[in-house]
């Protein structure tokens, strides 16, 4: 009887030390998987942090990407020697009125 209790105690302690996760969190109606980093052939979901949290991305496999084309985003990545940089494009729009406000005003040297 003592060996049975000892065995149960050892199994209970080992169950707490297991580092693997038995539950895989799914996102986007169980199509994607929450991961720290998506594989190159997978697409990450725009605003996936709402489903997976801020530290993880919602990664959708390539074969299921056609089901949700509006949500999936492919980022352009450029690979350098040790760093991978993601490029994004933004547009800058200025009106002529705001340009005239920024024009320098003449200042007299005597004040």
Curated annotation (Swiss-Prot):
Sorted alphabetically, the keyword list is: Antibiotic, Antimicrobial, Cleavage on pair of basic residues, Defensin, Disulfide bond, Fertilization, Secreted, Signal
Q: What is this protein called?
A: Beta-defensin 126
Q: PANTHER family, alphabetically?
A: BETA-DEFENSIN 123 (PTHR15001:SF3), BETA-DEFENSIN 123-RELATED (PTHR15001)
What InterPro entries does the record point to?
Beta-defensin
Please describe the quaternary structure of this protein: Homodimer or homooligomer; disulfide-linked.
Where is this protein found? Secreted
Whose protein is this, by species? Gorilla gorilla gorilla
According to its UniProt record, where is this protein mainly located? secreted
**What does the similarity note say?**
Belongs to the beta-defensin family.
UniProt entry tagged with the keyword Signal = yes
Q: Which domain of life is it from?
A: Eukaryota
One of this protein's GO BP terms? defense response to Gram-negative bacterium
Q: How is it modified after translation?
A: O-glycosylated; glycans contain alpha(2,3)-linked sialic acids.
For this UniProt entry, which residues form the secretion signal? 1-20
For region In vitro binds to LPS, mediates antimicrobial activity and inhibits LPS-mediated inflammation, the annotated ranges are 21-63
Name a GO CC annotation attached to this entry: extracellular region
Disulfide connectivity for this sequence is 27-58, 34-52, 38-59
**What does the UniProt function comment say about this protein?**
Highly glycosylated atypical beta-defensin involved in several aspects of sperm function. Facilitates sperm transport in the female reproductive tract and contributes to sperm protection against immunodetection; both functions are probably implicating the negative surface charge provided by its O-linked oligosaccharides in the sperm glycocalyx. Involved in binding of sperm to oviductal epithelial cells to form a sperm reservoir until ovulation.
Gene giving rise to this polypeptide: DEFB126
């Amino acid at each position: 009887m003592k060996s049975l209790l000892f065995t149960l105690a050892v199994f209970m302690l080992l169950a707490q030390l297991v580092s693997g996760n038995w539950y895989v969190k799914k996102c986007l109606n169980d199509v994607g998987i929450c991961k720290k980093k998506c594989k190159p052939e997978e697409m990450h979901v725009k605003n996936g942090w709402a489903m997976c949290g801020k530290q993880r991305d919602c990664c959708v496999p390539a074969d299921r990407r056609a089901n949700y084309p509006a949500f999936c985003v492919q980022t352009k990545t450029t690979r350098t020697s040790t760093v991978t940089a993601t490029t994004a494009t933004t547009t800058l729009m200025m009106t002529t009125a705001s340009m005239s406000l920024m024009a320098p005003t003449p200042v007299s040297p005597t004040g």
